[in-house]
Design a protein with these regions (language model features):
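Catalytic glycan-binding domains that act on GlcNAc-containing polysaccharides
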Residues: 3, 11-219
């Protein structure tokens, strides 16, 4: 399978956010958008594929797969790739919210929960509010900047995760389960991925069927 299909399969192998009400076809289509964005960001930071051109500056020291799996890891732990977060419709308690003059304001945007800092331009930040391919690709590329900065500072995957999470040390305790998740998905065989995707598909379809039954019983 090509790399975008590979990323899509990894994404589909993960538990969906409980709030997501997509059917399998809808979820697959959205995961394909995320996978395409991750593919672009991973290629750009490693100067591979269409970015393998004179003048490209490699910002990630590892290969394309390593940064792609790290983007999946961060996206899952930051938002579980929830549909409402992807679309920019965070609930009052999500996306690093606070209240000002009776208004709920969300500081973090996109599946990677990116806040406005010096690593993000105003234009980029303003565009990270939808589930379009363009918006998702911008967010994935910005997320890479944070991860690359952490890797440059700490020289380890755990360090990159730690710095991304706001820690000022390279061995933040909260990074351990995230690193374990990263190690698990990057080492999955094609057979393991396919089996996990099939399991998630069956669980999702059964859940949706159960919800329909309950809804009909309440009528």
């Amino acid at each position: 399978m090509n790399f975008i299909n590979y990323i899509t399969a990894i994404l589909l192998s993960l538990d969906p956010a409980y709030s997501d009400k997509e059917n399998w076809e809808e979820r697959t289509a959205r995961m394909e958008i995320i996978a395409t964005a991750i593919d672009d960001a991973s290629s750009k930071t490693t100067c591979s594929d269409k970015y393998d051109v004179p003048g490209c500056e490699k910002t990630w020291p590892g290969d394309k797969k390593s940064i792609a799996m790290l983007l999946i890891t961060k996206g899952f732990w930051e938002s579980k790739f929830a549909k409402n977060v992807h679309e920019g419709n965070c609930r009052p308690y999500e996306c690093d919210s606070f209240t000002s003059n009776g208004r709920t304001i969300h500081k973090a945007r996109s599946l990677w929960q990116i806040q406005k800092t010096g690593l993000v331009s105003k234009e980029e930040y303003n565009q990270m509010k939808s589930a379009t391919l363009s918006s998702t690709t911008i967010a994935a590329n910005v997320a890479v900047r944070y991860l690359a900065l952490g890797m440059k500072s700490c020289k380890t995957i755990r360090g990159a995760i730690s710095i991304y999470g706001g820690a000022r040390v390279c061995n933040w305790s909260g990074a351990a389960p995230r690193e374990a998740f990263y190690r698990r998905i990057i080492s999955m065989s094609d057979e393991q991925i396919a089996s996990s995707v099939n399991t998630r598909k069956n669980k999702l379809e059964n859940r949706l069927k159960s919800e329909i039954i309950v809804k009909n019983e309440k009528k």
